[in-house]
Structure formats: structure tokens, C-alpha cells
Amino acid sequence: MTNFTIVNGQIYTPGLAIVNAPQPYTPLGGDTLHISLDVSGNGQLSLTPDDDEPTRFHEITIFLTSSETERNFTVSNGTVPEILPFSSDSDSDSSSNQTAFTTAYTGPILSLEPGSTVKHINWVWPECFVGNGDSDDQGARGTYNISMHQSFRWNETDYYTVFDLSISVSNGIEESDERVECELLENEYRPGLSEESNQDLPGQPFVGDGVETTVIDGQDNGNEASGSGFSKALRWVVVGLVMGVVL
């Protein structure tokens, strides 16, 4: 079960990143998986921090994982991806085909859109997600977690946390030359990976007392409850299994 704490439509993770999109349990498809992250704590963090800054990011990596399909795909692993050519068809005139370029995964997230406090990840769905609804040839479509791994320092203490944001790959995804083979992105599925993150965060860095929050209970798949910040007991389980305000 994963609970999600939401303030004004933003999802606060057990870390420094704040998720603008997608919302929990959203059915997704289309050309790309779009993820929007605020990496400034809504203006409280420097985009170019000093090495000895008491609160700062080290790295964010993202994977798409599923216990249903037992698959694990790289969205961004912190490295610069290889640029891959593909043939771009031009309407009906095959003689005017041009070579275009794509990448299998997204580059280092904190380096995207330099100078911007919001990072937009547009990950092209690989071939095995092509289909509509539950129909596909390779069995990849279904329920997934956007698994966000954060390495960061908060108040002079270093942490490594894993946060799972549940979505479903159930909307239509059409064939495209831009889609890469899934084997290029696939990693070993490790269901116990989040358990390796074994530190408890003492709170959420950017949600204080008196802030009106909405907690979506993952066990009930979307039931909501409201609360007032962290004025009562709060416990973040860093492994991403339980998140939210304990009222």
C-alpha cells in the first residue's frame, strides 16, 4: 500500500522532489509517458547548490516497474543516453523519408531544462506497450509504478529514498518508428528493491504545520481524507511502502 500526500494538486514525496504530474492511478497512453517534477521545493532550493549545502539533491533516477507484469524499465538512470537514428516517414511520399533521432531513455533529470525549477520527462513508450486497453502482443501493458529514486541531503544528513507513484498503462499507444525495442530498457525485476532503503525520514521537507493536505489511500485505490499538515504524528517510511500523514 502507498498513500499519497497532496497539497494544491502537488504530490509530496519522501524527499526533495515534488510531483506535478501525473496524478495517482491515472490511466496513461499516447506518444509518451509525461512526468513533471518541481526540484526547487517550490522556490526554496537553489538550482546550483554548493557542494556543502545543508539541503540539496544529489541525483534522481526513475524506473517503470510492475508487480503485475514483473517488468522493470529504465526511464532515466542518471547517464547520458545514446542517440539512435530512425526513419521518419513524410506523409505519403516515401522518397522524402528523412533520418530522425531518438533516445531510448531520458538523460540526467537534474540537467534537463537548465535554469528551470520544473523538469519535464517525456519518455517515449517502447514497442511492447503498443496497444489499446489490456490488449497487446507482448504482455507489457497493465498496472505500473513510476518508481522514483532520490539521493539527497536534508539538514546536513544524506538520504536515499524510493517513492512509487501508481499509474496504469491502459490508454491507446500507437505504433511508431520512434519506439525502441523493450530489451534496450529492461532491467531485472526486483520486487524487494525498496526495502534496501532503510532510513526513516523525520518528516517531509516542504510540508509544515497548518498546511491543508489530502491523503489518497492507496489500499482503497483513491479514497481521500483531509488533514492539517503535520501537526500530529507523522512517519514517512522511506522505502515507499507507506506514505502520508498519520492522523
Features from the language model and the residues they span:
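Fungal secretory targeting signals
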Residues: 1-11, 227-247
